[in-house]
Amino acid sequence: LGTPPADMIKHIHDEGRGVAALCGSPSQARKHADAGVDIIIAQGGEAGGHCGEVGSIVLWPQVVKEVAPVPVLGAGGIGRGRQMAAAMALGAQGVWCGSVWLTTAEAETHPVVKEKMLAATSADTLRSRSLTGKPARMLRSSWTDEWAREDTPDPLGMPLQPILTAQAQFRINRAAERHPGAEKLVNYFVGQVVGTMNTTKTSRQVVYDMVEEFIEAVERLAAQLED
């Protein structure tokens, strides 16, 4: 959604805090770095919400090279330790996770949406402008299907599209638990990693499992070098 304004970055730095910003391309990353952003979050097209078109495995090393030595976090498709290991093998100094928290026990995700996510595969998401006016990855639903029809007007740009759809979304979410029509319409932002989010876990267990799998992946690769 753009580079943070200079006055905002200065204010945060004056408070002794760091600034991080998302990017979907090397050129966006360069703008962030030149503006004084401390951490670049390179988010691939697999990610939920607003995202670019370039896949994570291609994007991460490009951004790392573009902004070095500014630290980069890999994002987009991160929900397992092996994916974390892949990001760090490609030069990232850590990872940024979003979607994986939406089905945790602590998440305040709409109950119907959470059930949809738990049942979804990685093919059940798409990039749509139907909620915000900008391309954003979300669950496919009757809502996205209707907006994609050839006889439907194109979504308005941001911020007009959210103004247009906010009341409808509010009513859909309120009715989704008791009305099958609303249940088909309800959706939310989520990345392709949703296909691995098939059970409800605590946030603690998500972190624990990710770290354990990361260690196993790194040790397996190290063992191959020893052989």
Locate predicted features.
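Alpha/beta enzyme core
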Residues: 1-73, 80-99
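Conserved active-site-proximal phosphate/metal-binding subdomains
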Residues: 58-73, 79-227
